[in-house]
Amino acid sequence: RVLIVDDEKMIRMGMKNAIDWKKLEVDDVFTAASGNEALKILKEEGPEIMVTDIQMTEMTGLELIKAARESVPELRVIVLTGFDN
């Protein structure tokens, strides 16, 4: 089970649809547009892996990782970023 977190819908849906999750033996892929939405999904659905952007408006990816690890210490995290500087 994987959770994709990004405040840009095109990125979220692109990752969800472009990756062959079944080939990777992933049964469920959840998406969240914000850190708060991601924390709710983590508690309700229990994904093992979270892919998150760093630059988000409501809560940064680093803040999300810290909060997520407090409730799910064994969570594996993949961090993405796309800024130029």
Segments from the language model and where they lie:
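Acidic, metal-coordinating helix/loop segments flanking the phosphotransfer/catalytic sites
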Residues: 16, 31-49
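Receiver (REC) domain active-site loop signature in two-component systems and cognate sites
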Residues: 56
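Active-site residues of response regulator receiver
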Residues: 6, 53
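Two-component/phosphorelay signaling modules centered on CheY-like receiver
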Residues: 9-30
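Conserved active-site segment of CheY-like receiver
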Residues: 7, 79-84
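Acidic catalytic/metal-coordinating carboxylates
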Residues: 34-37, 60-63, 81
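His-Asp phosphorelay/catalytic-motif detector in bacterial-type signaling
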Residues: 46-48, 72-76
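Short amphipathic alpha-helix used as the core "switch/output" element in two-component signaling
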Residues: 40, 62-73
